């Protein structure tokens, strides 16, 4: 927008100055020098490509990772709870560690390799990036397990969570102004880890922020991790108990 305004002003100034031009161009040069004594050079810092894709795609990567893990964790939980395995606490924790281990290469691909391949800004520290991203994966895993405990059919999580993808695109505020989203919808978006993760991961990876500068997102993901872990353990315990008495 700033670039467009600057171009429009310079174009108008040039046209006004050229209105009384001389054959040698001296009047035009003098008028332009008085209107714009210094050349304006606009250089985007966090969006060097200057395109919409470089603004949207890094945030979309986070949402893609969340939706895949939500569906996968829920689906595997539906199947796992049909097996005669005791210990809700250990099983929930074990599955989350497995999800995190499997997702580490995906985090490296989506947050390190692909941004550099597409020429996106990558100013963040990898350790801080992976600290926040790992917490995001754990929160998503626990959420998927908590939800998956109450599904009867393995295909149900795919239908439900895919339907939430498009609303999350708008609620998180990167494809639509957050100020234009109703407060009730914003509050509803906080139940998904991607709401905090998109803001925090993009700020760290693309803008070079530290964990301290995204402490709101860090605390939000910790809160969701604890809440969904408790819900996943309780859900697994209740489902096991219902199966034992059913």
What are the language-model segments listed below?
Residues 1-72:
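Transport-system extracytoplasmic interface segments
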Residues 22-24, 107-108, 141:
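A generic alpha-helix surface/boundary motif
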Residues 28-39, 106, 191-204:
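Peri-membrane helix termini and adjoining interfacial loops of integral membrane proteins
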Residues 32, 41, 45, 49, ...:
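Juxtamembrane loop-helix boundary motifs flanking transmembrane segments in multi-pass membrane proteins
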Residues 43-115:
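Hydrophobic alpha-helical transmembrane segments of multi-pass membrane transport proteins
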Residues 101, 112-113, 121-246:
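Membrane-spanning alpha-helical segments of multipass transporters and channels
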């Amino acid at each position: 927008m700033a670039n467009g305004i600057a171009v429009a002003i310079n174009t108008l100034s040039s046209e006004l100055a050229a209105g009384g031009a001389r054959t040698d161009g001296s009047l035009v040069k003098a008028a332009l020098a008085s209107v714009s004594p210094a050349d304006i050079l606009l250089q985007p810092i966090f969006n060097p490509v200057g395109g919409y894709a470089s603004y949207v795609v890094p945030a979309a990567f986070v949402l893609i990772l969340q939706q895949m893990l939500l569906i996968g964790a829920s689906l595997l939980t539906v199947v796992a709870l049909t097996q005669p395995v005791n210990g809700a606490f250990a099983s929930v924790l074990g599955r989350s560690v497995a999800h995190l281990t499997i997702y580490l290469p995906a985090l490296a691909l989506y947050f390190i390799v692909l941004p550099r391949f597409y020429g996106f800004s990558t100013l963040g520290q990898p350790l801080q990036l992976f600290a926040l991203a790992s917490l995001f994966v754990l929160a998503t895993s626990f959420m998927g397990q908590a939800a998956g405990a109450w599904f009867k059919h393995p295909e149900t999580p795919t239908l439900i969570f895919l339907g939430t993808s498009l609303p999350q695109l708008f609620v998180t505020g990167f494809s639509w102004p957050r100020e234009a989203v109703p407060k009730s919808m914003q509050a509803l978006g906080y139940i998904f880890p991607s709401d905090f993760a998109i803001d925090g991961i993009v700020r760290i990876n693309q803008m070079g922020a530290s964990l301290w500068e995204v402490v709101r997102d860090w605390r939000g993901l910790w809160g969701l991790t604890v809440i969904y872990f408790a819900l996943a353990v309780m859900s697994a315990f209740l489902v096991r108990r219902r199966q034992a008495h059913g």
